[in-house]
A protein has these predicted regions:
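Terminal beta-strand-rich extracellular "head" domains
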Residues: 103-124
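Extracellular disulfide-bonded cysteine-rich modules/repeats
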Residues: 126-135
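Exposed extracellular interaction/assembly regions and N-terminal maturation sites
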Residues: 18-105, 135-153
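C-terminal trimerization/auto-chaperone modules of long, extracellular attachment fibers and adhesins
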Residues: 1-21, 26
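Short solvent-exposed loop/turn micro-motifs enriched in small/polar/acidic residues
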Residues: 6, 37, 124-127
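Short, surface-exposed charged micro-motifs
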Residues: 12, 43, 131
Length: 153
């Protein structure tokens, strides 16, 4: 049995156990391809409250650090034993290199993003799709796993 929770206008369904969906699952997309991602220096902000899929453009500078915010509309962040998957669809440029530094909710993540293949993907001048799993295990240890599919044209 599920329970509908959350603030007015931002409800969430909490389910303990399996959930079987008999049709399509449609996700909300946050932002627009023409919108610049929020950058401070060489740190890109990745908010997860709005949607699991975020699109935008990158500046012509290196992205050294990925700053994930897992807070929902009520300010609740990932609890122990929870994870979230977020996909960035980037109208990219090859000058915006991707790094592996990482924070989650303002806290440094030891070893940064653990990329598939061991290294960050190379940025391209076409569309790059980067997917991240932000995971907090039962003891509170946070890891971030990244996968890059690049050069869609």
């Amino acid at each position: 049995m599920g329970v509908l929770v959350g603030p007015s206008g931002s409800p969430a369904l909490e389910v303990d156990g399996a959930a079987v969906l008999g049709g399509r699952v449609i996700e909300k997309v946050f932002s627009q391809f023409s919108t610049n991602f929020s950058m401070t220096g060489n740190t890109i902000s990745v908010p997860t409250a709005g949607a699991n899929t975020v699109c935008g453009t990158t500046p012509t500078t290196a992205i050294n650090t990925w700053a994930f915010s897992t807070a929902d509309a009520d300010g609740n962040t990932l609890a122990n034993g929870q994870s979230i998957t977020v996909t960035l669809i980037i109208d990219a440029n090859s000058a915006a290199t991707y790094g592996d530094g990482c924070t989650v909710d303002g806290n440094n993540v030891a070893n940064g993003v653990q990329w598939s293949g061991g290294s960050p993907p190379l940025a391209t001048s076409n569309t790059d799709i980067l997917s991240f799993i932000v995971l907090k295990d039962g003891a509170g240890v946070v890891r971030v796993y990244g996968q890059g599919n690049t050069d869609f044209s």
